Amino acid sequence: MYIEIILWKCYNRRRIFILYIMKVSVFMSVIRSINHLFNSYLSWIVLLMAVLAYLLPTVFSWMTPYIAYMLQFVMFAMGLTLTAQVFLDVFKQPMKVILVSVIQFLWMPLAGFLVALAFNFPPEIGIGFILLGACPGGTASNVMTFLANGNVPLSVSATTVSTLLAPILTPLFVVLYAGATSSIDIQFMPMFMSIVKIVLVPIILGIVLNYFIGSKIEPVKDVCPTIAAIAVLLILAAVTAVNQKQIAETGFIIFVACLVQNVSGYVVTYFVCKALSIDVSSRRAMQIEVAMQNSALSVSLALKHFTPQAAVAGAVFSIIHNFTGSIFAGICRKHDDQEKLENA
C-alpha cells in the first residue's frame, strides 16, 4: 500500500511537470508569434495604435501617469539583452560608434531647433522637437538595421553608447537650444536625474541581472522584448490620446515637421559617411541610428518637465520614423537583391 502511494505521487508529479512544460511551450510559441508579428508589421501596428488612441482617447489617456514606469521596463529589457560581446563590439569599431553619437547629438537637436523655427511652432510644441532631437537612438533602430541588411553589431553598440551618454548630453542640448530661445524655464539637473532614473538605473539593473543569473532566466529574457514592444505601443497610445485636441489643431503640419527632422538624419549621415568612405552596411546602420530617436523617452521627459503639448512631437515622430525606417529598409533590401541578380 505504501509503495502504491509513492508510485501514485510520482505519477502525479510527473504529470504536473509534463503539463507545466506543455504550458510553457505554448506560451513561448505565442510569444514567438507576437515577435514575428511586430517584426513584420511594426509600422502598421504603430499606425493602428495611434489611430485607435486618436479616435478613442478616453480608452488610453488613463495610462499617461504610468508612462515613466513603462519606459523604465523598456530600458530594463534592453539591459537584459546586453552582454559582454556588445561592449566588445564597441571597441572593435570605436570610430564608427563615436561618429554615430557625434552626428546624432550634434545634428538632431539642431535639426529640431531649425524645424521649430521654420514651422513657427509655439514654444510649448517647439521645445518638443528639440527634446526629441536631443534624445538617444531608439531600440527599433536595431530591428530596422537588420531588415536593411545593415551592420547590426554597430547599430546595437551605437544605441547602447548613445543611451548611456543621454543623462549628460540630452539635458545639455535641450538647455543649449531651447533655453536660449524660449521663455520656458529649463533646468539641467532635474532632467539629468529623470534620465538617470528612467534610463540608466533600469539598464544597469538589467545588465547586472544578465551577468549574474542570465542563464537561469532565459525564458524571462525571451519574453521581455515582446512586453517592452507592447509598452512602447501603450506609451504612444497614451500620448496620442492626451494630445488628441492638439494634434487635431496642428493637423498635417506636425507630421510634415516630424518627417523633415527624421529624413534630415538620413541625409546628413549619408553625406558624412560618403565623405569618409564608410562601407555600405555600416552606413545604413548609422543612417538608421541617427534618424530613429528614442521618442518614448522624449515623451516621458516632456510630460514630466514641460507640458503635454511638448510630447506631441515625440508621439507623431514615433509613427513617422517607423514608417520611414521600414521604407528605407525595403529600399536597401531591394537594392541588394538587384545586385545579386546582376552578379549571378
What are these regions (language model features)?
Residues Y2, Y11, R15-I21:
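Short, positively charged and aromatic/hydrophobic N-terminal segments
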Residues Y11, K23-A344:
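Alpha-helical transmembrane segments of multi-pass small-molecule/ion transporters
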